[in-house]
Design a protein with these regions (language model features):
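Low-complexity, highly charged intrinsically disordered N-terminal segments
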Residues: 1-22, 41
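Short, ordered loop/turn segments at secondary-structure junctions
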Residues: 22-23, 98
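Short polybasic amphipathic segments
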Residues: 24-29
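Active-site nucleotide/adenylate-binding loops and adjacent lid/helix of ATP-dependent enzymes
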Residues: 35-181
Length: 181
């Protein structure tokens, strides 16, 4: 769940919510009962869990060790590695940063070498570590687990824009992105 959803839930139960970090960091409750949150991370979340959740390769390895299905893929360091991995995995593929969240920098359903190299060149200017994986069509779900219990599941809907006949695409994207913060 997003920070906004957690805050709505707290307010629904008349719990005090204090913005202590420019809309990114909140305290819910007062005194010793108060809890801090940033996105879905709380003051109860262990540091190692946060580190794991931000590193897609470690997350994938841990899921694989538990015999959960993961997409075939690897970290790539240059165009030669990239093309070799794509041939081995098979198209379509996904390119994404190793570290990050909220789907930022993730490009899906890449179907050609030309598109792959173009996307890689774009990503390598923004991110140091890049992963290529096999693309599997289907829905994307986020699961929030608290105290070993699933408390929320959300379906991610890919971003899209509906024009208003007045603004250009860049203006519409900026408007939507600023509204999310």
């Amino acid at each position: 769940p997003s920070t906004a959803e957690i805050i709505k839930g707290a307010e629904k139960f008349n719990m005090p919510v204090i913005d202590i970090g420019n809309g990114d960091f909140y305290q819910i409750g007062y005194g010793k009962q108060g809890r801090c949150i940033e996105a879905a991370i709380t003051s109860e979340t262990r540091c190692v869990a946060v580190d794991i959740s931000c590193d897609k390769l470690i997350t994938k390895k841990l899921l694989d060790i538990q015999n959960l299905p993961v997409a075939r893929g690897q970290k790539v360091s240059n165009v030669l590695d990239l093309l070799r991995a794509a041939d081995e995995i098979g198209y379509p593929v996904v390119l994404k940063p190793q570290f990050g969240s909220k789907g930022k920098g993730v490009f899906v359903d890449i179907r050609s070498k030309k598109e792959l190299v173009k996307t890689y060149d774009y990503l390598k200017n923004q991110f140091k570590d890049i992963i290529i994986e096999k693309y599997h069509e289907g829905d994307d779900f986020r699961v929030c687990i608290v105290n070993n219990e699933v408390v929320a599941v959300s379906k991610r809907i890919p971003p899209f824009i509906i024009g208003d006949g007045l603004k250009n695409i860049e203006q519409l994207v900026e408007e939507i992105n600023s509204a999310e913060n």
